[in-house]
Amino acid sequence: GVQTCALPICKLDEINDIQEYNQQKMIKAFQEAGVRESHFSGSTGYGYDDFGRDALDRVYAYAFDAEDALVRHNFASGTHTLTVALFGILRPNDTMLSVTGMPYDTIRSAIGLEGNYPGSLKDFGINFEMVDLKADGTVDYEAVEQRIREEKPKMVYIQRSRGYSIRPSLTYREIKKLCEISKKASPKSIIMLDNCYGEFVEKVTPMSVGVDIMAGSLIKNAGGGIAPTGGYIAGKKELVEMCAYRLTTPGTGKEIGATLGNNRELFMGAYHAPFVSCEALKTAVFASALFEILGCDTTPKYSEN
């Protein structure tokens, strides 16, 4: 046990620093959003003037360095949240270019890559293209730049986590490099990030390095293990508004959607998310170090970001 703790001690100290930074930032987000007890009450019916719902959007927008956010309990999963964002932004004949290879399993059917489900992106005439990863699972930046320059896609799509494959997850540095390449090769392309499992594990946010819109799940990091369900979309205000029109109806957007008494748990989840996410990260680092000592090959290594 002592040996296992000593091995990754520098990494654990680094995570503690990230944890403290993001927790203080979340506290500031609550202050900036003016969160108070009355925001914990729910609404019914149409949900007009649900001040708690609106304050929660402001909290996540601040925490993620975004212009706006759409945080709702009725996002059923991360895949559902991503699908709403994709349909909110893309139109028939648009092209979505994945620069991190094949997306993970659950989003493929929504795109139209697997199965023949009605209502997929493919069903609506939206095109999907991708740039394969290198043999070692890292991003092929040269190929990405060439494809973006040639195709000028409506959307450049980045998947941050490894999903269900064995490849490195992306840090903000890789995301920043992809954003720089995209904005230089095709300034009008919208950069979208699947940020599932990527919240609060670094000090630098994807929005601050060039991402235009991102989405994730409250069932994972962003809900702090307290949010019972839900998801979020955050980014540029006009893009978030487009996604809100897809979630509800054009014209009403973020103005409707009863919270049904879920606000309190969602606020609690947001508050604890920076702490809980880093505790989970420390557990993963410890487990990786332990099994490496026992002679196992581990991925990711305890020393990886």
Short names for language-model regions:
Residues 72-74:
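Early transmembrane hairpin of solute transport permeases
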Residues 5, 300-305:
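Active-site loops and adjacent core secondary-structure elements that bind or stabilize anionic groups
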Residues 67, 124-127, 305:
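Generic structural motif recognizing short loop/turn segments at the entrances and edges of beta-strands
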Residues 6, 26-32, 36-39, 47-48, ...:
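Conserved PLP-enzyme active-site core in the AAT-like
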